[in-house]
């Protein structure tokens, strides 16, 4: 197959995609192998634009669909140049050659003049900047809210600790006053009641010894 001529007309042909090719496999080798199963219309091996080396797969076109199916059944899993081939029906048509792409600029995918990528790049930058700003604002807000919540929790914990200490001091003072009142009541209950003057005189009279008859006579005389 010569690369100088334009590609043949492949309309109405059935294409097979052959994967896992080596770099040294040529279109002539593929044609000789696949012509055993029917009339081959075209063999195309895509190559790198700069190195001109094979990209590792090829397209084989048959004029008859039945011949293509027979070749697929026979060559799928076969070994060629030390590689196990994978053959399947091609889903897309033949890709454009490199010399066709050099003639004109690539088709425009976006509307407007010039290239769409350049016109969209500042918009993307603006969007990315706005997104980064919104993210930084949201992060600063979240940090501010976190600091607020932390300060609130700290103030609450301090107030609760103060109230607890006040309660503890009040309970201690009340317990001390109660213990003092109890000790006073106990001391009062233990001390004997005061004795009146009359009771003391009567007691002293009753305690004095009885007089003898001689003393009584002397008193009477």
From Swiss-Prot:
Residues annotated as domain RRM: 14-92
Induction of expression: Accumulates in a hypoacetylated/phosphorylated form in response to cisplatin treatment.
GO molecular function, one term: RNA binding
Matching InterPro entries: Nucleotide-bd_a/b_plait_sf (IPR012677), RBD_domain_sf (IPR035979), RNA-bind/splicing_reg (IPR051106), RRM_dom (IPR000504), RRM_dom_euk (IPR003954)
Positions of post-translational N-acetylserine modification: 2
Gene3D superfamilies with a match to the protein in the record: 3.30.70.330
Compositional bias (Basic residues): 117-171, 179-189
Compartment(s) where it occurs, according to its Swiss-Prot or TrEMBL record: Nucleus; Nucleus, Nucleoplasm; Nucleus speckle
Modified residue annotations for N6-acetyllysine: 52
Post-translational changes noted in the entry: Extensively phosphorylated on serine residues in the RS domain. Phosphorylated by SRPK2 and this causes its redistribution from the nuclear speckle to nucleoplasm and controls cell fate decision in response to cisplatin treatment. KAT5/TIP60 inhibits its phosphorylation by preventing SRPK2 nuclear translocation.
A GO cellular-component term linked to this record: nucleoplasm
Sorted UniProt keywords: Acetylation, mRNA processing, mRNA splicing, Nucleus, Phosphoprotein, RNA-binding
CDD domains to which the protein is assigned, alphabetical: RRM_SRSF2_SRSF8
Annotated region described as Disordered, given as residue ranges: 92-221
Biological processes annotated in GO: mRNA processing; regulation of alternative mRNA splicing, via spliceosome; RNA splicing
Residues where Phosphoserine is found: 2, 26, 189, 191, 204, 206, 208, 212, 220
Residues where Phosphothreonine is found: 22, 25
Membrane-spanning ranges: none
Subunit structure as annotated in this protein's UniProt entry: Interacts with BRDT. In vitro, self-associates and binds SRSF1/SFRS1 (ASF/SF2), SNRNP70 and U2AF1 but not U2AF2. Binds SREK1/SFRS12. Interacts with CCNL1 and CCNL2. Interacts with SCAF11. Interacts with ZRSR2/U2AF1-RS2. Interacts with CCDC55 (via C-terminus).
Family statement: Belongs to the splicing factor SR family.
Function recorded in the entry: Necessary for the splicing of pre-mRNA. It is required for formation of the earliest ATP-dependent splicing complex and interacts with spliceosomal components bound to both the 5'- and 3'-splice sites during spliceosome assembly. It also is required for ATP-dependent interactions of both U1 and U2 snRNPs with pre-mRNA. Interacts with other spliceosomal components, via the RS domains, to form a bridge between the 5'- and 3'-splice site binding components, U1 snRNP and U2AF. Binds to purine-rich RNA sequences, either 5'-AGSAGAGTA-3' (S=C or G) or 5'-GTTCGAGTA-3'.
Protein name: Serine/arginine-rich splicing factor 2
Organism: Homo sapiens
Lineage: Eukaryota, Metazoa, Chordata, Craniata, Vertebrata
């Amino acid at each position: 197959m010569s690369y100088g001529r334009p590609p043949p007309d492949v309309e109405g042909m059935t294409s097979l995609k052959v994967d896992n090719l080596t770099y040294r496999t040529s279109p002539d080798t593929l044609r000789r192998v696949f012509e055993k199963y029917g009339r081959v219309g075209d063999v195309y091996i895509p190559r790198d634009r700069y190195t001109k080396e094979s990209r590792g797969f090829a397209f084989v076109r048959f004029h008859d669909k039945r011949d293509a199916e027979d070749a697929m059944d026979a060559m799928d899993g076969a070994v060629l140049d030390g590689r196990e081939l994978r053959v399947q029906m091609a889903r897309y048509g033949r890709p454009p050659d490199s010399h066709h792409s050099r003639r004109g600029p690539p088709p425009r995918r976006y509307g407007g003049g010039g290239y769409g990528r350049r016109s969209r790049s500042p918009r993307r930058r603006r969007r990315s900047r706005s997104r980064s700003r919104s993210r930084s604002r949201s992060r600063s807000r979240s940090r501010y809210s976190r600091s607020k919540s932390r300060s609130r929790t700290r103030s609450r914990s301090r107030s609760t600790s103060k109230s607890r200490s006040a309660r503890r001091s009040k309970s201690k003072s009340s317990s001390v006053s109660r213990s003092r009142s109890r000790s006073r009541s106990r001391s009062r209950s233990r001390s004997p009641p005061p004795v009146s003057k009359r009771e003391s005189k009567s007691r002293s009279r009753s305690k004095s010894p009885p007089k003898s008859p001689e003393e009584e006579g002397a008193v009477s005389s």
